[in-house]
Regions:
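C-terminal capping/gating helix-and-loop segments adjacent to ligand/active sites or protein-protein/ligand interfaces
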Residues: 371-426
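Conserved N-terminal structural module of periplasmic/extracytoplasmic solute-binding proteins
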Residues: 2-109, 130, 324-328, 340-344, ...
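Periplasmic solute-binding protein
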Residues: 109-114, 138-177, 209-229, 311-319, ...
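Hinge/lid segment of periplasmic solute-binding proteins
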Residues: 103-159, 187, 297-301, 366
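Short, solvent-exposed loop/beta-turn-alpha elements that line the ligand-binding surface or hinge
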Residues: 122-133, 177-182, 223-242, 290-295, ...
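Glycine-centered hinge/linker elements that transmit conformational signals in sensory
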Residues: 190-194, 229-260
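Extracytoplasmic/periplasmic substrate-recognition and gating elements
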Residues: 64, 252-253, 291-352
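Short helix-initiation/N-cap motifs at beta->coil->alpha
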Residues: 75-88, 104, 182-188, 258-272
């Protein structure tokens, strides 16, 4: 996740970058040889956010099937911190895991600029798995020379998660179908937020952060930061402009809790009931469960997202050239991304499959935690209708700078024009 953005059900350790590097330097890298070591093999996997493998019991299941394999996972909560650490380790050639996670906003950069630092999975037979994945998921991880640098774990079709208890106390409807009609457009969603604010229980906000609005609105368009020719167009993109304006509107209306996503205060806000709605890709369901805990069971629900269908996040598993256990690593990622495991992952955690056979299997899935919401139908419909986004090498960098600028609007009251100027400067500094 994305994501996977940041992309999920995690109590991931803050500051885990340094810990991960230390552990992986000891057990995850070394010679480029890919052969099996004698005796029991420890396969290291380094991720960000929550991929859900551990939470869904998949590691334990794999270890039972392969008693000579032990899986050791390290993770970093914030993807941008993870990515910076990964780039440092790739440049230095040390501290890399046998398997590294890659967010969808980074996969084009890996495929186009860093494919020489990762194994071509075709060499291990990955070409035979192509039929399992959606065309866009497979294509994004394919380099110009045909090398496949990663296997997809999930997609991020979007919906709206909301607290039924808070909406009820504010005198608003709680039925998911009624709400879907009331917020069929983003303007309708903001207008409903204004109504919520008048009778908001406690000090609760309508939404956690306007970053949530921006990311999900932008995720509903094919072109965001790059056009089909690979040209960077973010500052003239209609999709970015629409997402920016709606986010600023929500900030000025005082609808945001001004929470920094993925921060400790954001995590605590789930359990505290500090906000009523959260635009949520499928992988966010597991994150909500992890942070809201038992106290949130049955209070959350899921409805169709305002506007049109969109996608936020989704991830890949890749094998660095410096992996010590390449064959074992490939067998593990092949198994983790297989239709059977992607089906289990969605049913247990909420990560929506990027596997075509798995998508067909989860259509009838409901989630008791989210008021028995038909998540298979809601996210399945979004996945089917969402545009295939054009990905660029610096998608995630651009998005982070825009998010920082919007945070100034909701936290400091910075004007839209000034914040936009700051975003442009930030992007220029980030990518040159």
């Amino acid at each position: 996740m994305h994501i996977a953005r940041a992309a999920r059900t995690t109590l991931a350790r803050l500051g885990a970058v340094a810990l991960a590097s230390a552990l992986l330097a000891a057990c995850g890298t070394g010679s480029a040889g890919g052969g099996r070591s004698s005796g029991k093999v420890t396969v290291s996997i380094d991720l960000f956010g929550t991929f859900g493998f551990k939470e869904a019991g998949l590691y334990g299941e794999y270890e039972k099937l392969h008693p000579d394999i032990t899986i050791r996972q390290t993770d970093t909560e914030q993807e941008q911190n993870y990515w910076k650490s990964l780039q440092t380790r790739l440049a230095g050639g040390g501290g890399l895991a046998d398997i590294q996670g890659v967010e969808i906003g980074r996969i084009t950069s890996v495929a186009q600029l860093q494919s020489d630092k990762f194994e071509d999975l075709n060499e291990y037979g990955a070409a035979g798995l192509k039929k399992n994945f959606t065309a866009s998921k497979w294509g994004a991880a394919t380099a110009k020379n045909g090398a496949v640098v990663g296997l997809g774990t999930d997609n991020g079709p979007e919906a709206m998660c909301y607290r039924t208890d808070l909406l009820r106390k504010a005198g608003l409807p709680t039925d998911r179908d009624v709400l879907a009609k009331r917020w069929s457009t983003w303007q309708g969603y903001i207008d409903l937020g204004r109504q919520y604010k008048k009778n908001a229980p406690g000090k609760s906000a309508w939404i956690d952060s306007v970053r949530s609005i921006y990311t999900n609105v932008a995720g509903q368009s094919k072109e965001r930061y790059y056009n089909a020719s690979g040209k960077l167009i973010w500052d003239t993109s209609p999709a970015v402009k629409q997402a920016w304006d709606l986010s600023v509107d929500a900030a000025h209306a005082g609808l945001s809790g001004s929470l920094d996503q993925w921060s400790p205060s954001w995590n605590q806000a789930f359990a505290a009931g500090s906000f009523a709605t959260l635009p949520c890709p499928a992988w966010m369901l597991g994150y909500i469960k992890g942070q809201a805990g038992k106290s949130g069971d049955g209070k959350w629900d899921v409805a169709t997202l305002p506007g049109q269908a969109g996608n936020w996040g989704g991830s890949y598993l890749a094998i660095p050239r410096m992996s010590r256990h390449k064959k074992e690593a490939y067998e593990l990622i092949k198994w983790l991304t297989a239709p059977e495991q992607q089906t289990k992952l969605f049913r247990k955690v909420g990560n929506f499959p990027s596997s075509v056979p798995a998508i067909e299997k989860v259509a009838d899935t409901k989630d008791p935690y989210f008021s028995n919401a038909p998540i298979g139908r809601i996210f399945g419909s979004a996945a089917e209708q969402a545009p295939v986004q054009i990905l660029g090498v610096n998608d995630q960098d651009v998005q982070e700078q825009i998010a920082k600028a919007l945070f100034e609007v909701e936290r400091k009251g910075t004007s839209s024009d000034t914040a936009w100027s700051n975003a442009r400067k930030g992007v220029q500094n980030a990518i040159g």
